[in-house]
């Protein structure tokens, strides 16, 4: 089974992926880590400031094929990041889709207005938790 976790910034994607990894014992792939590895290695023309749409166009083909490989090999995987396209299903045949679950984490406008300080205060919880 492959779980896809995506959503807006500070929505808790990395924390959810970490908790799923701990609960299930499955590996997880952080698209942010992949992005920064490619950028720092000089293997891609992008920068950390590259717009999300361009970043998605660059990273998604690689991640998509990693997902297919995991399904083909009967392996479990958690993929986490904001660079998953909304139309991701279009890239998979039905026999792959049967093994993929997706969850998008989003905040409503009301939630953001009422909890803005809380969101900022917990923005880096996973990084601090692992120190």
Model-flagged regions — what are they?
Residues 15-62:
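Conserved substrate/cofactor phosphate-moiety recognition/catalytic segment
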């Amino acid at each position: 089974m492959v779980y896809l976790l995506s959503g807006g910034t500070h929505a808790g994607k990395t924390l959810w992926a970490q908790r799923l990894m701990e609960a299930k014992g499955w590996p997880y792939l952080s698209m942010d880590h992949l992005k920064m590895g490619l950028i720092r290695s000089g293997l891609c023309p992008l920068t950390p400031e590259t717009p999300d749409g361009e970043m998605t166009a660059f990273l998604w083909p690689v991640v998509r094929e990693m997902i297919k490989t995991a399904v083909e090999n009967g392996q479990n995987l958690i993929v986490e990041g904001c660079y998953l396209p909304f139309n991701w299903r279009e890239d998979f045949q039905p026999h792959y889709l049967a093994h993929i679950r997706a969850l998008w984490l989003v905040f409503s406008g009301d939630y953001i207005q009422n909890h803005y300080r809380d969101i900022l205060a917990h923005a880096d919880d996973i990084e601090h938790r692992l120190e």
